[in-house]
Amino acid sequence: MNLINIAIDGPAAAGKSTIARRVAESHSMIYVDTGAMYRAITYKYLQEDKNDDFQALIEDVSLKLVYDEDKGQRVLLNGEDITDYLRSNEVTQNVSYVASKEPVRTFAVKVQQQLAAEKGIVMDGRDIGTVVLPDAELKIYMIASVEERAERRQKENEENGIPSSLNELKKEIEARDHYDMNREISPLRKADDAITVNTTGKSIEQVTDIISDLIDKVEA
């Protein structure tokens, strides 16, 4: 079997991370959560009292992704495991702003491309198929309704002990979509050769099966 890279892009809470992780497990591939990288840098930004000197911020950042058999992917920032802090409301509310900055984007893309160099990677984000891995053998553009995405985010927040309002989450997701699609650097958009997968009303297993079928066709 030839090793391939899979790029999964799409808006917030479309199911990218959950599906990417499941696909990687079922095909013995390595999952790379690029969103966690940007959240880690955002966490650092917040620790630095929102200092907007992003070049200086990046120069003081060392990111490492490690894989724990029980806990899955963990994110180490300057040697400290900060994974459990990455889904906080404060990080979520600031990550789009931080991720849009050129020094941050350049740093993260370089790390992501290094991770994918040996192939066998499933990577999800906003600009994987368009910027990070433009030569990926399979590109997926994952979408879902705002309503369902808000419900998923609320459930995720509840599991992490974070209270949230469904209506507020809808507004946040719509605002995030607008920001991501209209930012100057690496805006969210579907790659010309990406295949759209709508996850609305579908189970994790159903979406995983759809993508597995696409993988089989690429590898055939």
Curated annotation (Swiss-Prot):
Keywords: ATP-binding, Cytoplasm, Kinase, Nucleotide-binding, Transferase. This is Cytidylate kinase. Belongs to the cytidylate kinase family. Type 1 subfamily. The gene is cmk. SUPFAM superfamilies: P-loop containing nucleoside triphosphate hydrolases. InterPro entries: Cytidylate_kin (IPR003136), Cytidylate_kinase_dom (IPR011994), P-loop_NTPase (IPR027417). One of its GO terms (cellular component) is cytosol. Signal peptide: none annotated. GO terms for molecular function: ATP binding; CMP kinase activity; dCMP kinase activity. It catalyses: CMP + ATP = CDP + ADP; dCMP + ATP = dCDP + ADP. One of its GO terms (biological process) is nucleobase-containing small molecule interconversion. Residues 150-169 are annotated as: Disordered. ATP binds at residues 10-18. It comes from the Bacteria. It is found in: Cytoplasm. It comes from Staphylococcus carnosus (strain TM300). Its EC number is 2.7.4.25.
